[in-house]
Amino acid sequence: RQRQMCIRDRVYKHMDIGSAKIRPEEMEGVPHHLIDILEPWEEFHVVVFQKHCLECMEQIYDRSHIPILVGGTGFYIQAVLRGIDFTENEENTEYRKKLELLAEEQGPESLHEMLKKVDPVSAENIHANNIKRTIRALEYYELTGEPISVHNEREKERTSPYNFSYFVLTDDREKLYARIEDRIDEMMSQGLVDEVRQLKDMGCRKGMTSMQGLGYKEILEYLDGECSLEDAVYTLKRDTRHFAKRQLTWFRRESEVTWIDKGRFDYNEEKILEYMIRELGEKEIYEKQ
């Protein structure tokens, strides 16, 4: 068993607290991949992730181990499991620059309103502040005349080349939201503001992919004098709750998902693990020694 992260922020060095990056002592000797592989100013998106992930998986299979994809970015997981082909998505640099300028002059909401008109499904799933994804969706529509959400649904029907199990752990919504708020309070006490300040001193700015992550864009707005720290934390908690809701909506649309309600297992991790191993055995993916 070797784990690969499907969480964008964890690929970046110097971004530990806001991404809740696993510490070496927590890995328990299990190799973890796609952690600390990029500098914060480097570009990262699903195509780059897919390439890195598939390369790691080949290496893991060559060692007769089983890769475990861990994380909450459903589209990234789908890109690997379904082998989504991104080669047809040629970039329209001139149109992209036009959209980037529009976002700079009129704010990200202006792009999001444009997206609502041509692709309401994508607009529902993409946060208004996620300029990169909004531009990518608009660019795809400009190039093809088809909403990227239609393309993504079509790609979901691809047959996966892998024999896999897809587990989604869920919980009572109020408990989930309470954990989110507690986690953010903990990140603040661990020094999230200082971490973002260090990134800013290194030259990281709002438009960078790394700074689009939850926790980073809100605190950066505070450090840039755009809001108070109290407002930044409030926005972070609200947007993280909304993100969790969108995650669950995404996973509900996925096929072949095994839902695990932690409450039904009395929040006992050993019981949950035994259940997972039993399913892996039934699918002949893993045999317990």
Q: What is the meaning of each model-derived region?
A:
Residues R1-Q4, R8-Q289:
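Phosphate/pyrophosphate-binding catalytic cores of soluble transferases and nucleic-acid-acting enzymes
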